[in-house]
Amino acid sequence: YGTASLGAAVAIKEQIEKGNLKGTVIFYGTPAEETIFAKVWMVREGVFDKLDVCMDWHPGDTTESGTQSSKALVDFRVSFNGSSSHASSDPWNGRSAVDAMELYTTGLNYYREHILPTSRIHYQFEAAGDVVNVVPDYAKIWTRLRGNSVEHVNDLYDRALDIAKAAAMMTGTTYETKLISGIYEILVNRTGAAIMQDNMETLGDISFSNDEVSYANTILKESGKPQIGLDGKLKPLMPTLPATGGSTDVGDVSQVVPVIRMSATVAAKNGPWHSWAVVA
């Protein structure tokens, strides 16, 4: 990932020094890629303001120019505070923070029926009491909301905050929300994608050795997937596509500078992503 980006930057630098290219190349180290938010802070501090264009790539199981957007998202935490009591001797004196959290997630799950098919709601319990015989006085949950535009994500966020408030009211608890961060969707650069496609066609398909294909099939077999090896064939330039899956803080970069994107095959075809199979 970073190594390939550095290699590309060095190659461009050498061509500039030889007089074959004109311009300036800047290599950015962008940390914490999978936490999504590092580039948000970099954009805020004006790190990319001097650029005419930014080039971004992502490893994948296909080789293609980037023509697809990504999902905007917002991350936030909700904490509920109640009052402890013995769960059997005097539960009537307790106010369960976990009850509030459960009602919050129930509200989110009923809300799913009324959101766009392109929207997503995720959550993870982070604190939910310690022992079973005590009414828990504290609970905390991390929530992530996604949509194909930041405007729609803001609508999801407003509704989720109302659901948290209602959950606290129903249980006689108090609640607090803490915004973690949020990111924009990618603005697809159609002109840049066509230029990237021309250059990728000059290079052609990626070739893999028999040993590499065999290793990929071993990974697929162990993952319970069809053994279809590696796909190094360059895809034709695709139409501009809306987001279908993930999110990236490159979206924020694309709001302030044109971004040209591509992916290259580094993993077995249709293998399970975010797993040790891809790491291997």
Predicted feature locations:
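Alpha-helix N-cap/helix-initiation motif
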Residues: 1, 90-94, 153
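Di-metal (Zn2+ and/or Mg2+/Mn2+) metal-binding site signature of metallo-dependent hydrolases
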Residues: 1-12
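Histidine/acidic-residue-rich, glycine-tolerant segments that coordinate divalent metal ions
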Residues: 6, 19-136, 146
